[in-house]
């Protein structure tokens, strides 16, 4: 850029063609000037050219030759007047010679009226002539430029007597040079040296067509046929009149010098790597080089320079060299480590300032920010209110889940006067959103990921709320969303008291708190704005104050099952019929009475048992006994209200045995259920595995094996996945799987990887399992011996097996010893898993 600028400057300032000489020609000149005879002839030629008499002869011959062509030629010989010194384009020193010649017309004036003020005055017409610019040298042998402007001698005489006319003459000369050569002159720093003329006066020529050519002049030239036809000349050519400026431009007191700012870089190979922060400082230079052109200053002692971290201030009040520059730097620099140098030959001030880059801590923070921007989504939703299954860290490395999640942003409220949605921005409605009601709180979940917390704005009214926010996609391009919600007209007493919006990783949660007098809304109006509304139903309604246990029993007890055992026929009669309201009320009363007893038992169970107590609990068979006891309580209720049975099965007498959702027949073949088993010595199942434990507050289940081939299973209670419209029971085999409504969610820290956290938790679980194996190794062997002994006693005395609490009935009265041993082993494993 600087090279092209210098070439343009040389082409603009150096109009004379450079001497193009070859090496051979230069050698010939060198040999010729070495001869005395050639030097004598050369000096005689120079004296002949500079002789005034010879120049007059030369000019008369040129005039006669041009006259034969019908052109009048006048030679202008400038006579010295005064000299103006200034700067050309703020880079080069130049001189302007104000000279005079008799060949120039006299200045003329006429009376005129000023259109702006209405005052009368004189309007001057000042003829002038210009010569071509030429290169010269100043007193210090520095390169400069010289211009000649020639006026009539009367004009110079008036300038010497009238100060205003002198200034008008100077402005006319400066305007002519700027207009003709397309340059800029420094008018604020004009000097008038004690010179009459700069350089050697050189005549110039003014040509114009002759008014009355002679017959000889009109004769065609002998070689005219060889050239193209000359266009006809106009009748009378008027001289070009340059209009004067009606309003003179104000001359500034100080001149702004010409300057350039260069960015200096070093070659750093680390910028060519594939790291995220490799090209962070590509656009930040190592230093700034500021070059200021001061052609009218001889040294820096004549100016004042002040450099700060963000600006440069230069001031010079020397007469003829008044400069003032205030420059704002594009980067923050270290003003203490900078240096300045003034080139006296080029009259140029160079200032080098190192750029202040960010510290190592700031660069590390920026690198961490870029790393978080580029990280991929782990697919794990973070919720502050959900329970975390991650085990507690004894060292306190894992913080609270609420601290790991990004802080909730407080959305700004837009002013009511300005429009909420900007007309220049395109807004979208979230493609998916849900609404749930909890008492007097409406919760909206807008499924929009990567929402910027600081972009959330809301406009709340009495019965409506307008929300807008923005997201950043993978290409770092913002996408704007808007959501307008309004309460339905059915609930006129409802109003919005407060609103809260929270931005999460994958959605936005909007909570609307309604007034206490409002009813639970069944629907709402939503859209992009108030003009585009659509009615939506509320998906879920939850009431915290209601008795969930009583309602669950009312809803989940639609059937009544009756069992009758015939000792003579060795048959079991099962009757299924829908329950009545009276029976349900009796069940509710019976459940409310032992409610206090159950609370006391739960408090006792919550206490941590001792080592002996844990061994006793292993031997108890609480699972099947509790289920059977509840079914025995229902038998007298079934006898009071007998209805026509739905299905009756006659089964042979079978031995009762404890079953864990499995049915074993006499042949040794077992039907394995879909419910999972797990041991304390193996890894725990995942959260999606089902559990076969009996939920006392919701349902009861039993399994009956008929003839060793059919499996009958019925749930006393409602399971959300079942179709409750069919009250009957199919004769085909049914297996019921019940899932927990509570969803466990894993929470991970932002500053740790998922694989690393998984390995850490697995290692901690392995250590706990090893400790448990060491503590329970001796107790497990004792339990196995006791369990095997009890199984052998049951084989010897089969009559006692009839009092067993299990419900699994097999066809054979006496089973093989192999089956008993396998049952005993399964029993031992079941107790160990508890």
UniProtKB/Swiss-Prot annotation:
UniProt keyword list: Cytoplasm, Phosphoprotein
Domain of life: Eukaryota
Any single Pfam family the record assigns to this protein: PIH1
Modification Phosphoserine occurs at: 378, 777
Biased composition (Acidic residues): 389-398, 582-596
Gene Ontology MF terms in the entry: protein phosphatase 1 binding
Biased composition (Low complexity): 597-607
Name of the protein: Protein kintoun
Feature: compositional bias, Basic and acidic residues: 552-571, 785-798
Subunit structure: Interacts with Pp1alpha-96A, Pp1-87B, Pp1-13C and flw.
The protein's role, per its UniProt record: Required for cytoplasmic pre-assembly of axonemal dyneins, thereby playing a central role in motility in cilia and flagella. Involved in pre-assembly of dynein arm complexes in the cytoplasm before intraflagellar transport loads them for the ciliary compartment.
Keyword Phosphoprotein among UniProt keywords: yes
């Amino acid at each position: 850029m600087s090279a092209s600028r210098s070439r343009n400057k040389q082409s603009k300032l150096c109009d004379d063609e450079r001497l193009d000489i070859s090496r051979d020609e230069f050698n010939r000149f060198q040999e010729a000037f070495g001869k005395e005879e050639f030097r004598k002839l050369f000096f005689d030629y120079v004296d002949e050219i500079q002789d005034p008499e010879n120049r007059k002869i030369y000019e008369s011959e040129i005039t006669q030759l041009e006259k034969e062509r019908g052109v009048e030629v006048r030679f202008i010989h400038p006579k010295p007047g005064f000299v103006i010194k200034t700067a050309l384009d703020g880079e080069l020193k130049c001189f302007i010679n104000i000279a005079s010649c008799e060949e120039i017309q006299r200045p003329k004036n006429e009376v005129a009226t000023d259109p702006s003020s209405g005052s009368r005055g004189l309007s001057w017409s000042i003829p002038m002539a210009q010569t071509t610019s030429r290169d010269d040298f100043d007193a210090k042998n520095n390169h400069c430029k010289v211009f000649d402007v020639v006026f009539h001698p009367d004009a110079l005489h008036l300038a010497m007597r009238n100060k205003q006319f002198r200034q008008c003459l100077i402005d006319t000369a400066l305007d002519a040079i700027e207009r003709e050569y397309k340059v800029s002159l420094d008018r604020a720093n004009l000097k008038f040296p004690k010179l009459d003329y700069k350089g050697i006066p050189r005549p110039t020529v003014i040509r114009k067509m002759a008014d009355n050519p002679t017959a000889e002049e009109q004769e065609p030239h002998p070689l005219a046929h060889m050239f193209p036809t000359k266009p006809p000349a106009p009748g009378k050519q008027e001289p070009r009149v340059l209009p004067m400026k009606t309003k003179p431009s104000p001359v500034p007191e100080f001149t702004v010098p010409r300057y350039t700012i260069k960015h200096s870089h070093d070659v750093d190979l680390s910028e060519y790597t594939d790291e995220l922060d490799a090209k962070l400082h590509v656009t930040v230079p190592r230093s700034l080089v500021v070059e200021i052109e001061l052609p009218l200053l001889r040294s820096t002692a004549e100016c004042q320079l002040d450099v700060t971290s963000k600006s440069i201030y230069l001031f010079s009040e020397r007469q003829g060299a008044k400069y003032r520059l205030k420059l704002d730097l594009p980067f923050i620099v270290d003003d203490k480590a900078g240096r300045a140098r003034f080139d006296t030959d080029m009259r140029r001030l160079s200032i080098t300032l190192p750029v202040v880059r960010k510290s190592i801590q700031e660069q590390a923070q920026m690198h961490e920010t870029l790393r978080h921007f580029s990280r991929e989504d782990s697919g794990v939703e973070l919720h502050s209110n959900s329970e975390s299954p991650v085990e507690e860290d004894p060292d306190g490395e894992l913080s609270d889940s609420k601290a790991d999640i990004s802080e909730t942003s407080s959305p700004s409220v837009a002013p009511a006067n300005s429009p909420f949605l900007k007309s220049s921005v395109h807004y979208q409605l979230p493609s998916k959103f849900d609404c749930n009601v909890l008492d007097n709180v409406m919760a909206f979940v807008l499924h929009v990921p990567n929402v910027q917390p600081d972009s959330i704005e809301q406009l709340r009214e009495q019965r409506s709320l307008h929300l807008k926010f923005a997201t950043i996609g993978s290409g770092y391009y913002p996408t704007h969303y808007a959501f307008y919600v309004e309460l339905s007209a059915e609930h006129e007493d409802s109003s919005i008291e407060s609103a809260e919006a929270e931005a999460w990783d994958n959605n936005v949660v909007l909570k609307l708190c309604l007034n206490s007098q409002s009813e639970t809304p069944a629907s709402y109006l939503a859209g992009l704005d108030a003009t585009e509304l659509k009615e939506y139903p509320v998906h879920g309604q939850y009431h915290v104050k209601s008795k969930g246990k009583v309602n669950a029993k009312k809803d989940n007890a639609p059937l009544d099952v009756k069992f009758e055992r015939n000792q003579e026929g060795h048959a079991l009669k099962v009757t299924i019929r829908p329950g009545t309201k009276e029976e349900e009320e009796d069940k509710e009363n019976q459940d409310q009475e032992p409610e206090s007893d159950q609370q006391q038992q739960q408090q006792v169970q919550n206490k941590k048992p001792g080592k002996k107590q844990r061994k006793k609990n292993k031997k108890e068979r609480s699972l099947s006994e509790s289920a059977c006891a509840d079914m025995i309580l229902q038998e007298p209720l079934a006898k009071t209200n007998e209805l026509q049975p739905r299905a009756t099965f006659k089964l042979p007498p079978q031995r009762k045995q404890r079953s864990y959702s499995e049915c074993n027949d006499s042949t040794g073949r077992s039907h394995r259920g879909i419910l999972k088993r797990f041991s304390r010595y193996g890894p725990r199942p995942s959260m999606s595995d089902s559990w076969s434990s009996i939920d006392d507050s919701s349902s009861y289940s039993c399994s009956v094996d008929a003839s060793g081939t059919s499996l009958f299973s019925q749930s006393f209670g409602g399971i959300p996945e079942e179709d409750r419209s069919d009250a009957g029971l199919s004769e085909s085999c049914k297996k019921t799987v019940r899932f927990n409504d509570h969803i466990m969610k894993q929470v991970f820290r932002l500053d740790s990887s998922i694989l690393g956290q998984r390995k850490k938790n697995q290692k901690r679980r392995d250590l706990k399992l090893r400790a448990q194996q060491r503590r329970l190794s001796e107790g497990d062997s004792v339990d196995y011996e006791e369990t095997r002994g009890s199984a052998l006693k049951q084989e010897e005395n089969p009559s006692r097996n009839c009092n067993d609490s299990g419900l699994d009935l097999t066809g054979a009265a006496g089973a093989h010893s192999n089956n008993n041993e396998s049952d005993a082993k399964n029993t031992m494993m079941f107790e160990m898993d508890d």
